[in-house]
From Swiss-Prot:
<feature type="propeptide">
    <location>
        <begin position="23"/>
        <end position="26"/>
    </location>
</feature>
<feature type="signal peptide">
    <location>
        <begin position="1"/>
        <end position="22"/>
    </location>
</feature>
<keyword id="KW-0800">Toxin</keyword>
<keyword id="KW-0732">Signal</keyword>
<keyword id="KW-1015">Disulfide bond</keyword>
<dbReference type="InterPro" id="IPR019553">
    <property type="entry name" value="Spider_toxin_CSTX_knottin"/>
</dbReference>
<dbReference type="GO" id="GO:0005576">
    <property type="term" value="C:extracellular region"/>
</dbReference>
<keyword id="KW-0964">Secreted</keyword>
<protein>
    <recommendedName>
        <fullName>U7-lycotoxin-Ls1g</fullName>
    </recommendedName>
</protein>
<dbReference type="Pfam" id="PF10530">
    <property type="entry name" value="Toxin_35"/>
</dbReference>
<dbReference type="GO" id="GO:0090729">
    <property type="term" value="F:toxin activity"/>
</dbReference>
<comment type="similarity">
    <text>Belongs to the neurotoxin 19 (CSTX) family. 07 (U7-Lctx) subfamily.</text>
</comment>
């Protein structure tokens, strides 16, 4: 009887751990997602890269995106 209860508790623990791990994996932001308000929420191997936006010389705020770590975008020369 004790073995059945112990086995049931172990199975319940394993299922709970698998569920928690699955929830944690889904909590991060994928590549290309906006991360302006939460810089630390990008998925593994992604970083939150920000730039300032200007329209006609007037600053319009900051935008941040989840991009691969080490990748840099630059403005194309016209």
């Amino acid at each position: 009887m004790k073995l059945i209860i112990f086995t049931g508790l172990v199975l319940l623990l394993i299922v709970s751990l698998i569920d928690v791990e699955a929830q944690n994996e889904g909590a991060c932001l994928p590549r290309g997602s906006v991360c302006t308000t939460n810089h630390a929420s990008c998925c593994f191997k992604l970083s939150c890269d920000c730039y300032r936006r200007f329209e006609k010389g007037v600053e319009k705020g900051q935008k941040c995106w989840c991009i691969p770590t080490g990748l840099r975008y630059s403005k194309e020369k016209e």
